[in-house]
Amino acid sequence: MALTISRAQYVATYGPTVGDKVRLGDTNLWATIEQDLLTKGDECKFGGGKSVRDGMAQSGTATRDNPNVLDFVITNVMIIDARLGIIKADIGIRDGRIVGIGQAGNPDTMDNVTPNMIIGASTEVHNGVHLIATAGGIDTHIHFICPQQAQHAIESGVTTLIGGGTGPADGTHATTCTPGAWYMEHMFQAAEALPVNVGFFGKGNCSTLDPLREQIEAGALGLKIHEDWGATPAVIDSALKVADEMDIQVAIHTDTLNESGFLEDTMKAIDGRVIHTFHTEGAGGGHAPDIIKAAMYSNVLPASTNPTRPFTKNTIDEHLDMLMVCHHLDKRVPEDVAFADSRIRPETIAAEDILHDMGVFSIMSSDSQAMGRIGEVVIRTWQTADKMKMQRGELGNEGNDNFRIKRYIAKYTINPAIAHGIAEHIGSLEVGKIADIVLWKPMFFGVKPEVVIKKGFISYAKMGDPNASIPTPQPVFYRPMYGAQGLATAQTAVFFVSQAAEKADIRAKFGLHKETIAVKGCRNVGKKDLVHNDVTPNITVDAERYEVRVDGELITCEPVDSVPLGQRYFLF
């Protein structure tokens, strides 16, 4: 006999369903559930008097020898994902990977159970009611200056760090390069202790090929070209030749001073080959004043770093001070001051907001401790989305913010994964991928996750007093969980390396315990492959006034005095 309950009662018990709108934090963004994969009346819920019990929603006979039995299931959760959309489902995990998005349960007693989502006695359950699940974030612009960055990253919902460095050396303060085989080995060994996935860039600044090849063979998943080492046409060509040969990505911070050529010369050196441009607006560095034009090319994968996101009344002043420190400039030297002033342009920063909203800029990253904040990639992405809704109105005619939400979440999940040849493994919650999952309460979305799951094991979470009688008494703050302890760290995070390094078995050579996964397909991608962010309009920049035009139309916006997801979330 069917039981009819009110929509309000259903939402209170099982969470929102199709058509329900959920506000993201204190932004003005509302996500509407597009599809519900659960069977009404057969929802799985754990707890006293609930349905996940032996013989009910939990099988009384299925053992883990059955490959369809889950290790971990998140039930009744709202999913926000660039590829899956905004849906309601159970998430099934086995052996550290997502094996099902659908209906979990006991097929002996329930209809429509997804075939490989059986709940058994060996299954752990987490209630996803009133939570939002997203894929772990990917930050592709990491200066590995200190190991403590990883903690701040994972606490913000970022689970993969890609970049370079060797610690607080001046070369690392300024550039994201791990130079040479010796440092590559030692940085992999050091990163064994980090609770996040890691990939390292080699130093791409070399006009001959062998010094680049040896870094790729030692484990670098890509090469980074930086102007501080000389971003010349010869260097660019050499790095891209090695990239094409060894199937890795090249990231570039172009020549702010235009010493060895202008943007047109850099694009000529790139010669149509795919490349990942960092801080493509230019405040973080790059051809002044028109590096932003690079975003119009189909072979360019354009990224932002987060300090310019979004454009606020404090953005300009903050950048001048940051720049002087990060690039070892002296306020007493006129040439250094001129260098700094040439990079910080309100006009192009304002345009960057709009280019993100149009889907022209495709990736968001941090520039950690080197003119960017590792813990604010997610926050600033959603602050930008909210500002653009306020200033530009709705995108599309859906009557909700779903398209804008999917466009923006793609910028720090699936698109950086595509750019670096790791989308087969991370970047979305699709079946088959590593179960790096972030769970949020809607009111804290984008700011403070409830739980961060790494490879199917809870690694970080909000946790109260460990001596309390229940988990919730204050002080509540982020603490490492069992997935980030002891030998488990090596089982819950991976290293992304080149195919050459995988073939050379650097895991055994360096004595590593974490799984190494080779990147692939880095040279076959283009702007067209970047999800919801593949637009390639004509962009022009006025060389004197710095005004930016897209297809002939001036694009600009005002800085704001305040942003959501701000101080009210950080009083304690």
From Swiss-Prot:
Active site (UniProt): H327
Cellular component terms per the entry's GO annotation: cytoplasm
Pfam families given in the database record: Amidohydro_1, Urease_alpha
Record GO biological process: urea catabolic process
Cofactor: Ni cation
Binding-site positions, Ni(2+) 2: K224, H253, H279
PROSITE patterns: UREASE_1 (PS01120), UREASE_2 (PS00145), UREASE_3 (PS51368)
Modifications made to the protein after synthesis: Carboxylation allows a single lysine to coordinate two nickel ions.
Similarity annotation: Belongs to the metallo-dependent hydrolases superfamily. Urease alpha subunit family.
Chief place where the protein resides: cytoplasm
Taxonomic classification: Bacteria, Pseudomonadati, Pseudomonadota, Gammaproteobacteria, Pasteurellales
Subcellular location as annotated: Cytoplasm
Gene name linked to the record: ureC
Binding, Ni(2+) 1: H141, H143, K224, D367
Domain of life from the UniProt record: Bacteria
Pathway where it operates: Nitrogen metabolism; urea degradation; CO(2) and NH(3) from urea (urease route): step 1/1
Co-factor remark: Binds 2 nickel ions per subunit.
Full protein name: Urease subunit alpha
Ranges for domain Urease: 136-572
CDD domains per record: Urease_alpha
